[in-house]
Amino acid sequence: MKKRLHLIIADSELELVPESIIDHPAIVNYAKRRKKKPEKIILDSTYHHAALRQLEDGERRGRPDIVHICLLNALDSILNKEDRLRVYVHTRNDEVIYVDPSTRLPRNYNRFIGLMESLFEKKVVPEDLQLLRLEKKTLAELINEISPDAVFIMHENGEFMIPKHFGKLLASFKKPVVIVGGFPHGDFRSKVEGVKISLYREPLMAWTIVNEVIVSYEWEVIK
């Protein structure tokens, strides 16, 4: 069996506008400009920061940009081109996006948002190819489905390990899962068992961690 890295962007702050703030002026005006129903748009702190103050955890929510950048980097990696990577997005509301390795995401952020809105509505996009598929599922359920032989959680308080050594560790398993938080700060909301790893003495952005993990694994499995 070919070794593959299974990368999960977990507890991602990617969600439709919650019902509790649908009538907020910041949401209503934004929806009107885009000619969409408020309940059909993706929550985005860039445009909805005033409404976010009314939400629990509002300071960390509405960050689809994190998912966008992480996916662009992962899907364009050599590891993915060599069919050695599988990527999943798990959201704060326990939805899982299955990402086909051949998916070519829009580089343009606004087009990416439109794509995510279509995905949340239709559950699969495009409907004929199903490159992206959305299912209701917890992080624990996703990990159980993958059935890995090791689970690593990237965490600022984890065991320190330089990327090169972490790559060697990952490559010693056939089906490792690496979990990266898809949120700007704070801790994971989901409870999951695994070995916590830190790659640097300071906190790093999610997409930086994704890059470091992928490249460290590439060095070990692609010759």
From Swiss-Prot:
InterPro entries: Alpha/beta_knot_MTases, Rbsml_bgen_MeTrfase_EMG1/NEP1, Ribosome_NEP1_arc, tRNA_m1G_MTases_N
Site description Interaction with substrate rRNA, residues in chain: R63, R104, R107, R111
Site annotation Stabilizes Arg-63: residues: D65
Residues engaged in binding S-adenosyl-L-methionine: G181, G186, L199, Y200, R201, E202, P203, L204
GO terms classed as biological process: rRNA base methylation
Keywords of the record: Methyltransferase, Ribosome biogenesis, RNA-binding, rRNA processing, rRNA-binding, S-adenosyl-L-methionine, Transferase
Record EC number: 2.1.1.-
Summary of subunit composition and partner proteins: Homodimer.
Family: Belongs to the class IV-like SAM-binding methyltransferase superfamily. RNA methyltransferase NEP1 family.
Protein name, as recorded: Ribosomal RNA small subunit methyltransferase Nep1
Organism annotation: Pyrococcus furiosus (strain ATCC 43587 / DSM 3638 / JCM 8422 / Vc1)
